[in-house]
């Protein structure tokens, strides 16, 4: 994952050609060239899937997490967001918490990097201020990937759910207008596209939502929070009202405030308590697998997350107790890492951090206690200070 909220990460920043026909051919990428180690326990692999065009083609970097066995498995597609700046510097998206959720329920999880992002070839198609067109262009990449996946013996082409966060949520809603065979439902986590330089961007977003809803027949589930740094309550409620105005079936889960920025809910430890029960109920309504049948893919933390405290603001480096200059620099580096994450410290100045899929609270404490004489405690988890003086 990258380091901006458009792709479910840590620090909140504000983000300021013709139709292609989808054909697909998959080739394994040399895993040795990947900076991120593949998770063998989750059967993680990386493919390139060729999106054929009339003139040009693009090769789409796609991550697959697959249950052990031959299938066929229901399919969950998870669409990434967009960082500000050059999208080629955006790292491969690995929503491990969500991947584990679906693997436990027997799904194969498909995570495509769209055209121009990360190691995918081609150029990101911006479409200027036309937010509706932007979403559809992104959705063409999702179509190409699904055309490949549904041709594989391991995939159940009649049981598909498509999800996305931020720009990926917007891509998911746009993809819904294709009414792709076998897709049962859509899940939108804080979806949208914000173009502050395009005048009335909110009106553009609302009008595009209305257009998407008028063309979509499958149900959708929407998640938005009140303190979302991109799409506040007025905006997301207008979007939802417009989307459903023509009869589209979309249920809005407005979960209020969460942490420093509700835009990050999908990837946060606290957020899973919001979205996972709702998504399970949604899958049940769609007639899709929703109960845990493969618990070996779970990743329970052995260290519970303490409650948020009012000890200090998250980004107040000078308020972090005990640590010296090197420790403050380490805390600053921690703030630039992805969720889930944890930072621990001890009265003797020892400190450590950990981030990523495998129990960051325990790893941070274990590392800290190597020098902390067993006195280390958690200072921050995700975007919450949990230190009690």
Where in the sequence are the language-model features?
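N-terminal cap/lid segment of alpha/beta-hydrolase-fold proteins
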Residues: 36-70
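Cap/lid segment of the alpha/beta-hydrolase catalytic domain
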Residues: 83-95, 101, 111-137
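Secreted/extracellular ectodomain signature
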Residues: 117, 165, 256, 290-389
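Alpha/beta-hydrolase active-site loop
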Residues: 130-152
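Alpha/beta-hydrolase fold nucleophile elbow
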Residues: 154-165
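The feature captures the conserved acid-bearing segment of alpha/beta-hydrolase catalytic domains
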Residues: 185, 191-246, 251
């Amino acid at each position: 994952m990258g380091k901006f909220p458009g792709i479910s990460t840590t620090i909140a920043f504000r983000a300021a050609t013709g139709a292609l026909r989808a054909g697909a051919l998959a080739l394994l990428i040399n895993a040795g060239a990947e900076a991120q180690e593949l998770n063998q326990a989750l059967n993680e692999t990386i493919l390139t899937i060729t999106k054929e065009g009339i003139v040009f083609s693009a090769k789409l970097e796609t991550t697959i997490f697959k249950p052990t066995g031959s299938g066929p498995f229901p399919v969950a597609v998870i669409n990434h967001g967009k960082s500000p700046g050059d999208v080629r510097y955006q790292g491969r998206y690995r929503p491990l918490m969500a991947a584990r959720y679906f693997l436990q329920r027997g799904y194969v999880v498909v995570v495509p990097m769209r055209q121009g992002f990360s190691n995918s070839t081609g150029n990101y198609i911006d479409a200027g201020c036309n937010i509706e067109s932007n979403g559809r262009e992104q959705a063409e990449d999702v179509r190409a990937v699904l055309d490949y996946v549904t041709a594989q013996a391991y995939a159940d082409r009649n049981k598909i759910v498509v999800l996305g966060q931020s720009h990926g949520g917007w891509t998911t809603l746009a993809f819904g207008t294709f009414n792709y065979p076998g897709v049962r439902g859509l899940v939108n986590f804080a979806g949208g596209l914000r173009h502050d330089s395009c005048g009335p961007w909110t009106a553009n977003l609302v009008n595009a939502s209305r257009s998407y809803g008028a063309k979509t027949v499958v149900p959708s589930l929407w998640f938005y929070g009140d303190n979302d740094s991109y799409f506040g309550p007025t905006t997301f409620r207008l979007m939802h009202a417009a989307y459903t105005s023509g009869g589209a079936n979309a249920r809005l889960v407005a979960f209020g405030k969460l942490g420093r920025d509700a835009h990050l809910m999908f990837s946060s430890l606290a957020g899973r308590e919001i979205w996972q029960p709702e998504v399970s109920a949604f899958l049940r309504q769609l007639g899709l697998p929703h109960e845990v049948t493969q618990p070996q893919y779970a990743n329970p933390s052995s260290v519970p997350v303490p409650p948020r405290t009012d000890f200090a603001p998250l980004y107040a480096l000078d308020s972090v107790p005990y640590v010296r200059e090197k420790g403050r620099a380490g805390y600053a580096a921690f703030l630039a890492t992805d969720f889930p994450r944890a930072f621990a410290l001890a009265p003797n100045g020892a400190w450590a951090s950990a981030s990523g899929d495998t129990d960051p609270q325990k790893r941070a404490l274990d590392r800290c206690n190597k020098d902390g004489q067993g006195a280390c405690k958690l200072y921050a988890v995700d975007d919450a200070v949990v230190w009690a003086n």
